[in-house]
Regions:
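Acidic/polar alpha-helix N-cap and adjacent early helical turns
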Residues: 223-234
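Hydrophobic/anchoring residues in structured secondary elements
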Residues: 1, 156, 203-204
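AMP-binding/adenylate-forming catalytic core of the ANL superfamily
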Residues: 82, 87-88, 110-197, 207-209, ...
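Conserved AMP-binding/adenylate-forming
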Residues: 1-2, 6-25, 29-119, 125-128, ...
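General small-molecule cofactor/ligand-binding pocket signal
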Residues: 23, 202-205
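A structural micro-motif
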Residues: 20, 56, 151-152, 200
Length: 234
């Protein structure tokens, strides 16, 4: 995984079709490519990418002070170090320097580590939506919306505002036969989310941009939304 866990429906479909056990891990190309993984058994934890591999250290850092490690259960930037971490980018000292904090590699992902070491990814740092001075993690809102029976899949993104901030909006792939009900969805979200996390608007998409693993590509969906809004204004 990168930046998000596999949607539970993707896991269920794969396991039902193959009869196998899907065990999820997490890493990046710079990590050769994995640093965290679930146990190869039913001890795996759905919604989590697992625990650090042997000889690999992972910590959740305060985004405002990377020297400070967050308490268990508190969101922060995922940092890692270990023998599989790359040494740097070829002929690009500036990018290499930006990728590390001391000996720790900066993954660019936000996550949470529980008391027992299991890690849950929250969002790519670049995908965090800043609205009214608050940070909104798209994955948290998407997880709630995916449980709604009228929604097949969803991408929560920021809709740019003139003042430089963003509105939280949801781009929806509706279930067969379902109709878009913005007010009903807002009421549903208000019962489950803090007020500032509730999407201001819901957009129906026939298809949402995804990668080969079936994960939503939020930045592509956001670009599609912006193009759509610009076309509607013209």
């Amino acid at each position: 995984s990168g930046a998000s866990t596999l949607p539970s429906d993707t896991v269920n479909k794969w396991e039902n079709y193959t009869g196998g056990l899907l065990v999820e891990g997490y890493g990046l190309t710079e990590c050769s490519p994995i640093i965290v993984g679930n146990p190869m058994s039913t001890d795996r934890r759905p919604g989590y990418v697992g625990i650090p591999f042997p000889d690999t250290q992972v910590r959740i850092a305060n985004p405002d002070n990377l020297d400070e490690t967050q308490p268990d259960g508190v969101e922060g930037e995922v940092l890692a170090r270990g023998p599989q971490i790359f040494k740097g980018y070829l002929n690009n000292e500036e990018a290499t320097e930006a990728a590390f904090h001391g000996e720790w590699f900066r993954t660019g992902d936000m996550g949470v580590m529980e008391e027992d070491g299991f890690i849950r990814l929250v969002s790519r740092i670049k995908e965090i939506i800043i609205t009214g001075g608050f940070n909104v993690y798209p994955g948290e809102v998407e997880e709630i919306l995916r449980e709604h029976p009228s929604i097949d899949d969803v991408a929560v993104v920021g809709r740019p505002r003139e003042d430089g901030s963003e509105d939280v909006v949801a781009c929806l792939d509706l279930a067969d036969g379902a109709a878009l009900d913005p007010e009903g969805l807002k009421d549903y979200c208000r019962e489950r989310l803090t007020r500032y996390k509730v999407p201001r608007t819901f957009y129906h998409f026939e298809e949402l941009a995804k990668d080969q693993m079936g994960k939503i590509r939020r930045r592509e969906v956001q670009a599609d939304l912006i193009r759509r809004l610009e076309a509607e204004q013209n």
